[in-house]
Amino acid sequence: MKRIALILASCCLAWGAEKIEILRDEYGVPHIFATTAAGAAFGSGYAQAEDRLEEMLRNYRKAEGTMAEAFGKEFVFDDYRQRLWRHRQVAQQHYKDLDPKIRAICEAFQAGVKKFMQLHPEQVPAWAPKLEPWQLVALGRYIIWGWPEGEAAGDLQRAGIRPDPVAYHGSNEMLLAPWRTAMHAPIAVVDPHLSWYGEFRFYEIRLYGGELEMSGATILGLPFPSLGHNRYLSIAMTTGGPDTSDAYEEEVRDARYRFKDEWRPLDVRTEHIGVKVGDEVKVEDVRIESTHHGPIAAHKDGKAYSVAIPYANEYRLLESGWQIATAKNLADAKRALAGLQYMGQNIMVGTVDGDIYYVRNGRVPVRPKGCDPSRPMPGATGECEWQGIHPFEDLVQITNPPQGYMQNCNVSPFAMMKDSPLVPERWADHPYLYNDTRRPPNQRAAMLVDLLDAARNVSAEQMIGIAFSPQVWHAELWQERIRKAAPQSEFGKLLAGWNRRSDADSRAALGFYFFKTALGAFGRMVDPPEALTDDAVRDALAKTEQKLNGDFGPDAVFGTLFRVGRRGGSRTWPVSGGSLVDAGMATPRAISFDPVGKEMVGRSGQTSTQIVILTRPPQSYMVIPLGESDHQESGHWDDQAQKLFSKSQAKPTYFLNRKELEKHVTTREELVY
């Protein structure tokens, strides 16, 4: 490849073509150097295709709703959902309306993908879709859609209507003010929790080209990171936010629906979904009916229910992402967010100027007084029609709180810090902007508030330790219960003397897990219930000791059972921490596990953890849970799982430090765009 690229360079550079360098470090992470942002995007497209071409092409098919024509009938319903929301149509219609700079970046990115496909036709699957730059717009819409769709689904559920399930999304994010850190600069933790497989499997990348200088995680098939940092600031997001979407109860009769005093015709369209059957592609027609509120998604008791999403005709997400990627200060970041293109999220921004900032972001409709958007609203009366979109200034937000820290692990703004000034009463006129209560924090958030509130002179190493902490919330309450019920039990003393960390090498942590599961429903509780008897505790201890010594042996530890490794691989490694719902155990480090043989192997949770010290320039550390490449022979298929993630470590990014990067370069490619 290098020889081909150099030949191209010698032939073409005289005509003003741009040279792009792709330097890969010892973990296969691409560091792309170009003269322009478009050149960097070209390199990004090439590198992503080199590592995960098939997954990228699947992402485009998912967004368009054309999976079934390539992979069969099991994807028909998924395709229907994407057709329902018109991702392809909106993207095709409005691509021309994007900022020319964004169009140039999209086109350069796909040119890079096409270049790789041209040079490596043996890697191009027969089902590969034709590449078009508008697919990046469709993919952006597809990626954010689960959040507003989930809000509307919640409205339907509260009316007793079971909507189609929407995937769970969770995350951690933290910010420390300069006065709490050893470097006297803010520290950010960017820690999304999603599936380790599929469209949310992030791609790690560093990009340098023109005004684009960024490190972070991007969705495969998009040109630059959405989570990470540039030279001036960091950006993190977690699930949670204002109520952005609604359901309406509609009166429908004979292909018409009532609105005020008239019966309007339903908007009816037919989507033709290709379905692979053997060697053929057959077509299934699906009928989609909509009112002016949105598509009809459910029926019950003679009523139809439409879903109204304010992002339905939006297409400028990439523009907002670009504005964040190139922002130079907090004011620039706020202007980018004010475009209201991002889904409902808790967004945190830290800057090299020393700012820490939070906004409960989203595109939020203005609802009339007296209407309850938490349930389906009447569609026929006209009394609950949207009255525009709330401006960015209306959203819940705070800059530089006196506490000197913030965290949001999918919690209410009230639970982000001790004595939080962000209380729901301040938004009582429009409670859907706050969209939460003074509810107590979940275990992850409660632990992090305690840790951050006590933090002083925090180093990068200490912040990495916090991000990967395996401390089990309220384990001390169970230890006290064990002491009370079985003060003479030697095995009970092992658990009672445990340091309450689910470290991979801890036998007591594994024993605690088995003890909690032996308690049945009581063990799934975070705190010991009053109804738990001493006899039940002693019985669970006896069962646990027998299981631990009999089924697992004297050397078994937490990491004997809880492992990390890639699906389809032949090896796994012990890992610390995780969210063990069946035992009521949670740690700041989030990992969810599935049984694989006799092991519990991670499948979701921390997907691209970043620790960013906002010095000038920033210093950062990052890890993904598996590996950068989908090519098993590359050496980067599961190397981060083995060498970093299983050891609760993150590697330096060498951001804006090419001299140091050069010491770690393992491959070097030159391309021409």
Task: Indicate residue ranges for each PLM-predicted region.
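Hydrophobic h-region of N-terminal signal peptides that target proteins for export
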Residues: 5-16
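C-terminal/peripheral segments of proteins
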Residues: 17-480, 500-673
